[in-house]
Amino acid sequence: MIITIFGPPGSGKGTQSSLLIERYNLKLISVGDLLRNIISSGSELGKKIKDTVESGNLIQDGVICELLYDQLALMDDNFLFDGFPRNLNQAHFLTQILRERYNRDVDIVIELQLNDKVAIDRLKNRLVCLDCKSVYSTSSFKDDNNLVCTRCKSARLEKRIDDSDLSAIDRRIGEYHVQVKSLREYYRDKLLMIDANLNVDQVKQEIESKISCSLV
């Protein structure tokens, strides 16, 4: 099975992706994680990507597609794309590379739909565990001096660099709304629209229910 999941910033793509790969025994391909790994390497490309991300702009398609091309060379044909494709050009690339490598296409496309105000509130308060990638809200912790991941017990919880600037957040959300219209049309026969304003368990249940119906 090949699944792709996309949605605006703060919609819970990473959280739901983690649940989906466990539920359906899939490998995860996260564009965000790939980019963050390059940034943390301190390379020239990493510095350029860091500057782009901090300004709220999107990474060039060529960079994204090259990363995905290399990653797919290491995978079989059961995986989930977290946060990809982000525009129609990337969708065409994905269709082409899947047909070349596996003679197939994406089976299920999940769009997480989220109110803009909710997205902004989530992003302003988001913390991410640097070790296991679990996501938290600052409101989950009573003591700001005792931030510990409940999953892996790491104390390395930090804000993402692209969550620190409100104007950058607004640009990311605005760009998403521009690009998602063409993605909906391109994937209209495979698209599952999910209300991401709900809590994590409710979103998980809605996704699994709609996947079950689509596979009948």
Swiss-Prot record:
Signal peptide: none annotated. Transmembrane segments: none annotated. The keyword Disulfide bond does not apply. GO terms for biological process: AMP salvage. Pathway: Purine metabolism; AMP biosynthesis via salvage pathway; AMP from ADP: step 1/1. SUPFAM superfamilies: P-loop containing nucleoside triphosphate hydrolases. Keywords: ATP-binding, Cytoplasm, Kinase, Metal-binding, Nucleotide biosynthesis, Nucleotide-binding, Transferase, Zinc. It comes from the Bacteria. One of its GO terms (molecular function) is adenylate kinase activity. Its EC number is 2.7.4.3. It catalyses: AMP + ATP = 2 ADP. InterPro entries: Adenyl_kin_sub, Adenylat/UMP-CMP_kin, Adenylat_kinase_CS, P-loop_NTPase. One of its GO terms (cellular component) is cytoplasm. The keyword Signal does not apply. Residues 30-59 are annotated as: NMP. Zn(2+) binds at residues 129, 132, 149, 152. It is found in: Cytoplasm. ATP binds at residues 10-15, 126, 135-136, 198. Residues 125-163 are annotated as: LID. Belongs to the adenylate kinase family. Catalyzes the reversible transfer of the terminal phosphate group between ATP and AMP. Plays an important role in cellular energy homeostasis and in adenine nucleotide metabolism. Consists of three domains, a large central CORE domain and two small peripheral domains, NMPbind and LID, which undergo movements during catalysis. The LID domain closes over the site of phosphoryl transfer upon ATP binding. Assembling and dissambling the active center during each catalytic cycle provides an effective means to prevent ATP hydrolysis. Some bacteria have evolved a zinc-coordinating structure that stabilizes the LID domain. NCBIfam families: adk (TIGR01351). Monomer. This is Adenylate kinase. The gene is adk.
